[in-house]
Amino acid sequence: MYKIPTLPLKQEIETKPVLKQLVEAHKCLAELKGAVKSMPNESILINTLSLQEAKDSSAVESIITTHDELYKAELFASQYATPASKEVKSYADALRTGFSLVKKNNLLTNNIIIEIYRIVKQNSSGFRTTPGTTLKNEATQEIIYTPPQTHDEITKYMANLEQYINDASMSDVDPLVKMAVIHHQFESIHPFSDGNGRTGRIVNILYLVLNGLLDYPVLYLSRYIIKNKGEYYRLLQNVRDNGDWESWILFLLKGIEETSQETIVLIHGIKALMAEYKKGIRENLKKIYSQDLLNNLFRHPYTKIDFICEELQVSRPTATAYLTQLEIGRAS
């Protein structure tokens, strides 16, 4: 039976293979940080990638929606939202709120984690208070792990985790290694009745922001986890069964490397598409062109008059005219 350790871990976890992979992960993460700075407006990335991450992270939990449904939910609130797209939108809202709170407080506390969870799940509860939670093999329904059952245990472990997250003096291991430890510890504590996976994946990215490895929450591991879902759960459990921290840490470091590279390619693609649209609007609709309008179109895959009014500080008739001319220009 796995006994959750008090952090920091006592065993050596920065092995030679881990240190070697750390070099690649940090290199790619630094390149991503630089690529983000080259964007004309970072909020374009935050909006685009947070929705993509929300979609992918929810898919890990078998909550499936399409981009079209998600963008409609973002645009029209409850009018066109499916139950799945509402859940995914709540995840994106939780991510943005968490980012704002971490930047404001320069801390990632349990109160912030609980607030993230409440937005994800759209309820007002906190850490589990009733026993009975178990983790099962999806295929066989066999119980593979039983997390702490009492509220006191959960609170004790989460207090230790909170300190480990925020007090750098507790451990001198690399922040990316710490992120892997934090993620495993959170999953093992399983502090909430539901939504632990999604909340934990938000904690991952916010921890990178907290440590200055990224300025904005733009690195998301959910697609990597989906692609390697079986291995993810196997390695998660292998730490509990066999104490194999090295394989778990290497898995997440490789995910950081791959995901950073994929996100850099995506950023270059967005910039190229923005340049193409900028050229087209300036040549064909020069009377309405502005960088702010271009940013709005890329910040909101589906835009509307209210967004134009608010972000460009123009009247409704002007915003309506902009969208009408853009629609005519697209059709011609």
Feature-to-residue mapping (PLM):
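FIC/Doc superfamily catalytic core
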Residues: M1-S332
